[in-house]
Amino acid sequence: MKASEWIDISQPLNNEIATWPGDTPFSYEVSCTKEQSGSVNIGKVTMSIHTGTHIDAPFHFDNDGKKVIDLDIHVYVGPARIIDVSSMDSIGVKELQQFNLEGVERLLLRTSSHGNAQKFPDIIPFLCAEIAPFLSKKGVRLIGVDVPSVDPLDDKELAAHHQLFQHGIHILENVVLDHVQDGDYELIALPLALTEADGSPVRAIIRPL
């Protein structure tokens, strides 16, 4: 692969992809065929916003929070650093202090804890809320993880979600990082222009810097 080539770090969306328990399953179907319309196939998608690779908006966990359309799109495009935290059950300040994060605006964490997009995990590594001010001081504006949430799966308080956004750090979840090395990349992970949404699917791609 050439250094200038883009690498897809998104979960493919198909009818077999795992969803949060009790959430809307992903479904794609051709609702009108070329034979029926006389000219084109027309597809229909039904899904939860939080299926596959996606971003969270504050409205996801705060009724008064910003919706997707209100978010700064510049946050989702630019230099990013991938680091490996695969040996950690939880990621706090102590765990992150071993990495050089000065000036890093977008940080992607490889936990390598769950590589099967067709099965929802039973347990995931999670982010400790204490990392929000620590990362903010470093200059981080976006954090990405290769799991469905930055908080424990059964957590209702969502302390990491709240603290990250309170410190100006946006959230990207369910990226796929097992096939890429640690290092610095250019990231594009733009959300859709959804005016009322609490999150958005993204096509996340990177290329080495």
Swiss-Prot record:
One of its GO terms (molecular function) is zinc ion binding. GO terms for biological process: anthranilate metabolic process; L-tryptophan catabolic process to kynurenine. Its EC number is 3.5.1.9. Pfam families: Cyclase. Binds 2 zinc ions per subunit. InterPro entries: KFase/CYL, KFase_sf, Kynurenine_formamidase_bac. Homodimer. This is Kynurenine formamidase. It comes from Bacillus cytotoxicus (strain DSM 22905 / CIP 110041 / 391-98 / NVH 391-98). The gene is kynB.
